[in-house]
Amino acid sequence: MRRQMKITAVIPARYASTRFEGKALADIMGRPMVQHVYERAAKATLVSEVIVATDDERIAAAVRAFGGRVEMTSPTHETGTDRLAEVAARIDADIIVNVQGDEPLIDPAMIDEAIRPLLDDPSIPMATLKCRIKTLHDFLSPNVVKVVSDPTGNVLYFSRSPLPFFRDKWNDLKDDAFVSGKLLCYKHVGLYVYRREFLPVFAGLQPTYLELAEKLEQLRVLENGYRIKIVETEFESIGVDTPADLDKVLERLKG
């Protein structure tokens, strides 16, 4: 009988933010944003436990106040992956899920969808999600990361540029082509799942040329020859980068 794998969701949370300082503690209907993320992650069927990883005592205190588990991390980490690797090194888990701390509307089913490839195939070190692009604005926006993959779901590339480039239709791109599915393209959903043993490998890799060009850390994995499995999801969330994004979250929760 195969041993049941222990799967831990880790939520990296910082207080400092250039566009929205203290957003992890932003009030959403009486609870801090980090609590919303924590509670939704805990509802994922495949997740055994949830941990908030932070270097800020204000966030740690808020997590403890609602009964959550918190791990304090070094304040010198340059990336969320480094913070994740520090926590992974001292907890008992087989699979680590990196749940973004600014996704208060994340659906627990999305987390389960991203985990399953690692349960089905022991050779996969890392997995993530994608969803269909349905507007021309998203397709053209450098703030929306596009992704292409092979027929078996292995990522080929992530980019801030339009991807793929529809050469024959470029001068006649319209929203309805994306809505109808005539033009199929996907945006990356920033939820990552790792085998625990892969995290220190990833964190130990040097930044790569394409990673630095696109400012996309996950390209470091591809440039070093590792596979990333990607799964399409029907669910969409709202990342909170600004106070205006927070207003959108509140509107959806109230509506």
From Swiss-Prot:
Transmembrane segments: none annotated. Activates KDO (a required 8-carbon sugar) for incorporation into bacterial lipopolysaccharide in Gram-negative bacteria. InterPro entries: Cytidylyl_trans, KdsB, Nucleotide-diphossugar_trans. Pathway: Nucleotide-sugar biosynthesis; CMP-3-deoxy-D-manno-octulosonate biosynthesis; CMP-3-deoxy-D-manno-octulosonate from 3-deoxy-D-manno-octulosonate and CTP: step 1/1; Bacterial outer membrane biogenesis; lipopolysaccharide biosynthesis. It catalyses: 3-deoxy-alpha-D-manno-oct-2-ulosonate + CTP = CMP-3-deoxy-beta-D-manno-octulosonate + diphosphate. The keyword Transferase applies. It is an enzyme of class 2 (transferase). Belongs to the KdsB family. Its main location: cytoplasm. It comes from Citrifermentans bemidjiense (strain ATCC BAA-1014 / DSM 16622 / JCM 12645 / Bem) (Geobacter bemidjiensis). The keyword Heme does not apply. Keywords: Cytoplasm, Lipopolysaccharide biosynthesis, Nucleotidyltransferase, Transferase. Its EC number is 2.7.7.38. This is 3-deoxy-manno-octulosonate cytidylyltransferase. SUPFAM superfamilies: Nucleotide-diphospho-sugar transferases. It is found in: Cytoplasm.
